[in-house]
UniProtKB/Swiss-Prot annotation:
The name this protein goes by in its record: Mediator of RNA polymerase II transcription subunit 6
Family: Belongs to the Mediator complex subunit 6 family.
Source organism (scientific name): Kluyveromyces lactis (strain ATCC 8585 / CBS 2359 / DSM 70799 / NBRC 1267 / NRRL Y-1140 / WM37) (Yeast)
GO terms assigned for molecular function: transcription coregulator activity
Places the protein is found: Nucleus
Subunit structure and binding partners: Component of the Mediator complex.
Length: 268
């Protein structure tokens, strides 16, 4: 079973922490157990040298990384870089390790940020000289979990995919707000205004009332036949509301048709 990409992997070892604990002095040792660590790096070489030097230590000498070795290194004229002075002063173990790494060339890992008790940032870099390094990647140790920082390409790709999704969703919703009229062309739906709706309702009710009153008014008698016809029409209109509504709808449609013919088409 193949492992997922390293920038999608989370690694932790509760057993290791239960045995040794996790603090700034041994966070690089904890990191060296993860799949992010390169076993051919200079850190592994220094670690092997330290193990052999401790086994072959003569009486009176101190192993690599001890306080006496650090004092000797400082007395030998090793000057810490300006951006590393704080960590070198607070954590002598890392100062001694970086002193040894500065003598070598190749891949190495150093501690660049400490926020105890649960955050450390480790940097992978290529060393080409005592003061010449190239940053390759950063790793985060948050609590007991180790993560690899994503690349700029992955970050931009993720942001573009997210932007594309939301933009497509917005355009699909915007497309639902467009309506088309033969006389005026395409246009956006206007938001419903409560004031306009109430005015339109009042106008409609007023027009209906006027039409009803006008229909119920008797006309002068011009003859028996006309009087009977008008009375029958008024009675039918006042009794049958559906017929009155049909008459009103016909009148409104005639006005809308006249307005559409006179209107200038507006295209978007």
């Amino acid at each position: 079973m193949s492992l997922p990409p390293l920038d999608e992997l989370q690694w932790k070892s509760p057993e290791w922490i239960q045995t040794f604990g996790l603090h700034t002095d041994n966070v690089l040792d904890y990191f060296s157990e993860s799949p992010f660590f390169d076993k051919t790096s200079n850190n592994q070489v220094v670690k092997m040298q330290q193990q052999f030097s401790q086994q072959s230590q003569v009486p009176g000498s101190m192993p690599l990384g001890s306080s006496s070795g650090i004092g000797a290194a400082a007395g030998a004229g090793t000057v810490s870089p300006s951006d590393r002075s704080l960590i070198w002063e607070r954590y002598p173990v890392h100062a001694m390790l970086e002193k040894e790494l500065m003598k070598m060339k190749g891949i190495e890992y150093i501690l660049v940020l400490v926020r105890e008790p649960d955050l450390w940032i480790i940097r992978k870099q290529q060393r080409d000289g005592p003061t010449k390094t190239t940053t390759l990647r950063d790793y985060y140790v948050i609590g007991s979990a180790v993560y690899q920082s994503p690349t700029v390409y992955k970050i931009i790709q993720n942001r573009l995919l997210s932007t594309n999704y939301h933009l497509s969703h917005s355009l699909s919703q915007l497309n639902k707000l467009v309506e088309f009229h033969p006389a005026q062309g395409a246009s956006f739906l206007r938001p419903e205004d409560p004031l306009c709706s109430s005015v339109a309702a009042a106008t409609t009710s007023g027009s209906t009332a006027s039409h009803t009153v006008a229909s119920s008014v008797s006309v002068p008698e011009t003859g028996p036949i006309n009087a009977e016809t008008s009375g029958a029409t008024a009675a039918a209109t006042s009794i049958d509301p559906d017929r009155r509504q049909d008459s009103f709808n016909t009148e409104i449609m005639d006005k809308l048709m006249a307005t559409s013919i006179k209107a200038n088409p507006v295209y978007i």
